[in-house]
């Protein structure tokens, strides 16, 4: 008797799991780029996040900091990801 009940319960749960799954489209991410004077430090990503947030007034999910040389000077090259906002017409 117990095995029959367990079979019915497990079968019902399996059906719910298989039929209940919906496909969700991933939200697109947009990239924003900026640069600062100097080299990236240990907390370069945090510095980029603060700088880019202050400049664009957007909330960023993640930022990377890369050192580049422009006109014989080091620069922070900040590349930050945020959710894309729909264009308003």
From Swiss-Prot:
Its main location: secreted. Residues 1-26 form the signal peptide. Keywords: Antimicrobial, Disulfide bond, Fungicide, Plant defense, Secreted, Signal. It is found in: Secreted. GO terms for cellular component: extracellular region. Disulfide bonds join 30-84, 40-65, 48-78, 63-80. Belongs to the DEFL family. This is Putative defensin-like protein 230. It comes from Arabidopsis thaliana.
